[in-house]
A protein has these predicted regions:
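Outer-membrane beta-barrel and related beta-rich outer-membrane complex signature
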Residues: 772, 809-813, 857-865, 906-912
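Outer membrane beta-barrel transmembrane domains
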Residues: 784-789, 871-942
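Beta-strand-rich solenoid/repeat architectures in extracellular/passenger domains
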Residues: 34, 40-48, 56-71, 82-101, ...
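Extracellular beta-solenoid/beta-roll
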Residues: 465-468, 474-617, 621-622, 626-677
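Transmembrane beta-barrel architecture of outer membranes
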Residues: 210, 269, 382, 412, ...
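Outer-membrane translocation/initiation segment of Type V secreted surface proteins
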Residues: 4, 38, 584, 589-595, ...
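Outer membrane beta-barrel translocator domains of Type V secretion systems
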Residues: 681-845
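Gram-negative bacterial Sec-dependent N-terminal signal peptides
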Residues: 1-38
Length: 942
């Protein structure tokens, strides 16, 4: 018996045994008047006691109120005594004040009870004053001793109900003590369905201890039906078996379906607790056990050697509510053999340690179906499977093991094996370890194999590791995964192999062999090995490795389509050291760029022994500094054989301003070859072209707008009325770099001022941009002041002063995508002289000359990718010579015009600085000569 609470220890064990002895020798209520006559039906209020040659009845009904010390409802004894009831046996014992030790039915002394329609046995111990003379008042529902036998029949299920309000009391639903009689002469019970309820739904939960079935010293229970047990007490055992005084005895249990619910309200509890050597338990169909406890909680606890058990499809649900360092065990056994169909274990603890399956010694656990473990606890450790000292666990079906908890200092194992033990998974397995969010000090291991232990996964394996702890560690043990191939392997966390001394002080070396050979297979983590150990990883058929830190292997295979990504550990260069490289068209992804604190310019692959012939691709990833890496001939691969080749697979874009073309060079080094960055070429990416070209957009739009008032001034010169006016027009600007479709809205007011016509106008231009690989917007808002002086010789002098603000944005598509927006101010002053000549028939000719000075203020902005872009001030000085020819009508005129323009200035510069340190600068010269032609007219309406 375990330590169930503060009251129950070795003292309770002694008291229980003493109570059993006392109960078998003294019955103060044994002889009652009801025993004097036999009848077809027996009804009595005292003990029905049968001896000698027994008795036969139809129905037996015993009702005893406030029975005395050591009473029994039915007591049978005697070597040839068979008491038979052809109908239901009903026994009810009740007390309300003083309470004693009771047996509902006691079958003793080689006697037999044959209850063909089963029993209905109830003990209602409502009294709380213990007068038994013992530390605990005992209650036994059905008690069988000294080769006694009970047959409950199979027609109707039997029910045993025991309630006790006394704090100092304990109960056994069925208690069988074989007294070492030997095979064939055991104390035994058989029948169909049996239900045992102890303190079920009883408000007074004070009972010290309850056991559903107790088998001692060579006892046997054989039920053709189901056994259903419900227990609530300070401490509980669903089924308990032991050989207390004799060696060589065997207790056996046989049922069809087993269901146990146990609630230990102030102590520990177990579902099945087998303590006798070579005991046997066989559940043919299914086992369901749920235990809630305040201290230790066990599902199936086999605490002896040579025990055999078969439990069918098994479901264990275990909860410990204590914050103390106690234990929760799903299946625990020593040097014994058990079998299961499907096995499901759900374990929870507030502070107890959890081991879902624990196998110690040379025993076996054979799970013929699927295994599902969900263990979540806050103790010192949480384990899925633990196999020790030659133990062997086999899982034939799929396995899903999840362990987790919130204790920041705990240790978690999905599978833990040591000292020549073996754990084998024949089908796909999944192992998940979880902890709280954020930083955690929890040590998490998917698989841990130590000191000559072997863990094998014949098919697929998935290991999800909550804080990227260890996926699998072989510390003197062995782990093999997917050796036959064809299954998905998905690992997160460290994979390592190292040496360790076993219990015989012999040094054992770790071995890890993993075959990643499907496109869905991957490894995300780092790998290590120590001298003498083996770490062999094979990547083929599109599988990949995201390497999370410096790694070492004995053997690495990277086949065609598979990738080793050394850039997965962001912020640092990584080293991959292998003894032997087997590769054929594999790809290594490496970081290269600016020097780090250790003097490295790149990740590095080091081959210590052998490398296979073939050409491997290297894909460079960089965040900047590639030019420095090239100048220093960064070493990417060290120690390759002469026929092991490497080549850069693609150009490199470092998320900056350039795309780099890298060429590798091999350098002989002591008979081996190092592969280094040999040469580097670069070209600007199209985002640079677009951002650089945006200045051209601003310049073109502003210059184009300088001539938009010429039409209004021409109208005034042609005699148009002054006053309020408005115009809407559109156009298209473009070149090799962009096209800008725009619309312009103008309105203004002008009036006569002496010899001058003067006015003011506001204009808004809205442009839509298309780049080779992007789009954008261009907007201008400006205010103009203008005046025209009409000479008497048909000459005119026009002056325009303009001030505005330019807005622009760009959205760059594709591989080099980026976004940016800018704004700046602009100013222009223009002077134009023209003179009109009459050609007759209302035809006129008008030569024109114009000078315009403009300025676009410098500006800067930062793109979404962090590129700092700055433009200098742009000064413009444009001269124009033109001619207009037209014909006047009574309501207006029509004309054609042509001009030649030249930019005498138009110089600026642009600089860019990317977040990765790459820089770009260019001078921009917009000086040019161009031609403008047009046709138009003016019509007066009304």
């Amino acid at each position: 018996m375990q330590k169930y609470n503060q009251k129950q220890n070795s003292e309770l064990r002694k008291k229980v045994l003493q109570s059993l002895i006392v109960a078998s020798t003294a019955y103060v209520c044994t002889f009652g008047g009801d025993n004097a006559a036999w009848a077809s039906d027996y009804t009595g209020t005292d003990t029905l006691s049968t001896g000698a040659w027994g008795a036969s009845y139809d129905k037996i009904t015993i009702t005893m109120d406030d029975p005395g010390k050591n009473c029994a409802g039915i007591y049978t004894y005697g070597r040839n005594n068979t008491t038979t009831a052809t109908e239901r046996v009903t026994v009810t014992l009740s007390d309300a004040g003083d309470t004693y030790g009771y047996n509902g039915i006691f079958v003793d002394g080689v006697s037999k009870l044959d209850a063909k329609k089963g029993i209905e046995l109830t003990i209602n111990g409502l009294g709380t004053n213990n007068q038994s003379g013992e530390a605990q008042a005992w209650r036994h529902g059905l008690r069988i001793e000294t080769q006694g036998k009970v047959d409950l029949g199979t027609d109707i299920g039997s029910v045993i109900t025991i309630n006790s309000n006394a704090a100092e009391s304990y109960a056994n639903g069925v208690f069988v003590d074989g007294s070492s009689a030997g095979t064939g002469s055991e104390a035994s019970i058989k029948g169909g369905d049996l239900t045992v309820n102890i303190n079920k739904d009883n408000v007074m939960q004070q009972m010290d201890y309850a056991a559903g079935v107790t088998l001692y010293n060579g006892s046997k229970m054989e039920l053709a039906g189901d056994l259903d047990i419900h227990l609530e007490a300070a401490g509980v055992d669903g089924i308990r078996a032991n050989n207390l005084n004799y060696s060589g005895d065997i207790n056996t249990l046989q049922v069809k379906n087993l269901a146990i619910y146990g609630k230990a309200v102030n102590g520990s509890g177990s579902g099945i607790y087998l303590m006798g050597e070579n005991d046997s338990a066989n559940v043919s169909d299914s086992t369901k056990i749920e235990i809630l406890g305040e201290y230790n909680v066990y599902g199936i606890n086999i605490d002896s050697t040579g025990v055999t058990g078969s439990f069918g499809d098994t479901e264990l649900t275990l909860t410990s509510n204590t914050a103390n360092n106690t234990d929760v065990r799903g299946v625990r056994q020593w040097e014994s053999a058990t079998e299961y169909g499907d096995l499901t274990i759900t374990a929870r603890s507030v502070g107890a340690d959890i081991t879902s399956i624990e196998l110690n010694g040379k025993g076996t656990i054979n799970i013929q179906g699927d295994l599902k473990i969900d263990a979540q606890g806050n103790g010192r450790y949480v384990e899925g499977i633990e196999a020790n000292s030659l133990g062997e666990v086999k899982v034939a079906g799929k396995a899903d093991i999840a362990v987790g908890g919130e204790n920041d200092g705990s240790v978690m194992y999905g599978v833990y094996a040591q000292e020549h033990s073996k754990v084998a998974f024949a089908d796909d397995a999944r192992i998940t370890t979880t902890t709280h969010a954020g930083n955690s000090n929890t040590r998490m291991y998917g698989i841990y194999s130590r000191t000559d232990a072997e863990v094998a996964f014949a098919k697929g394996l998935t290991v999800k590791n909550g804080n990227l702890g260890a996926a699998m560690i072989a510390e003197g043990g062995k782990v093999e995964v997917n050796m036959a191939g064809g299954n998905d392997v998905k690992l997160e966390g460290t994979v390592g192999s190292s040496a360790m001394y076993n219990s015989a002080h012999e040094l054992t070396y770790g071995t890890v062999k993993i075959n990643f050979d499907t496109a869905q297979s991957y490894f995300s983590g780092r790998s290590y090995k120590t001298e003498g150990s083996i770490n062999d990883l094979q990547f083929t058929n599109g599988s990949y490795w995201d390497m999370k830190g410096n790694s070492s292997l004995t053997d690495l295979t990277v086949g065609k389509g598979s990738v080793v990504n050394m850039t997965a550990d962001s912020g640092r260069y990584c080293s991959l050291q292998v003894d032997n490289l087997t590769a054929a068209d594999g790809t290594f992804v490496m970081n290269a760029g600016a020097v780090d604190g250790g003097g490295s310019y790149s990740d590095k692959l080091t081959i210590d022994k052998n490398s296979a012939a073939g050409t491997n691709a290297i894909k460079i990833v960089s965040t900047g500094g590639l030019e420095a890496a090239a100048r220093n001939h960064a070493v990417l691969v060290k120690g390759a054989a002469a026929d092991t080749k490497f080549a850069i697979s693609d150009s490199v874009y470092a998320n900056g301003l350039y795309e780099f073309d890298i060429t590798l060079a091999d350098k002989e080094n002591d008979g081996k070859y190092d592969w280094v960055i040999g040469s580097l070429g670069k070209t600007t990416v199209n985002s640079v072209d677009v951002m650089s070209g945006s200045h051209r957009v601003a310049y073109g739009a502003w210059v184009e707008g300088n001539g938009t008032l010429r039409q209004r001034l021409g109208e005034l010169q042609s005699g148009a009325d002054n006053g309020v006016w408005a115009r809407i027009f559109g156009g298209k600007l473009g070149g090799d770099e962009f096209t800008n479709k725009y619309k312009t809205y103008q309105f203004g007011y002008d009036a006569q001022a002496g010899d001058w016509l003067v006015g003011a106008a506001y204009e808004y231009s809205d442009g839509s941009l298309n780049y080779t690989s992007g789009s954008g917007k261009n907007k201008i808002g400006a205010v103009s002041l203008y005046g025209t002086l009409q000479g008497k010789d048909n000459s005119a002098l026009d002056i325009v002063v303009k001030r505005g603000r330019i807005y622009g944005d760009m959205d760059i598509y594709g591989k080099y995508s980026d976004q940016g927006d800018y704004s700046t101010d602009a100013t222009s002053i223009g002077v134009e002289y023209s003179k009109r000549f009459d050609g007759g028939n209302n035809v006129y000719f008008e030569p024109q000359a114009q000078l315009t000075f403009g300025r676009i203020d410098g500006y800067d902005y930062i793109s979404n990718k962090g590129v700092k872009v700055a433009y200098d001030d742009l000064n413009s000085f444009i001269g124009r010579l033109g001619i207009v020819a037209g014909k006047a009508f009574s309501r207006g005129d029509v004309y054609v015009k042509a001009s030649v323009l030249h930019e005498f200035s138009g110089n600026s510069s642009v600089t860019m600085l990317a977040a990765n340190g790459e820089s770009y600068s260019a001078d921009k010269d917009y000086g040019d000569t161009w031609l403008e032609v047009g046709i138009g007219g003016n019509i007066t309406l009304g």
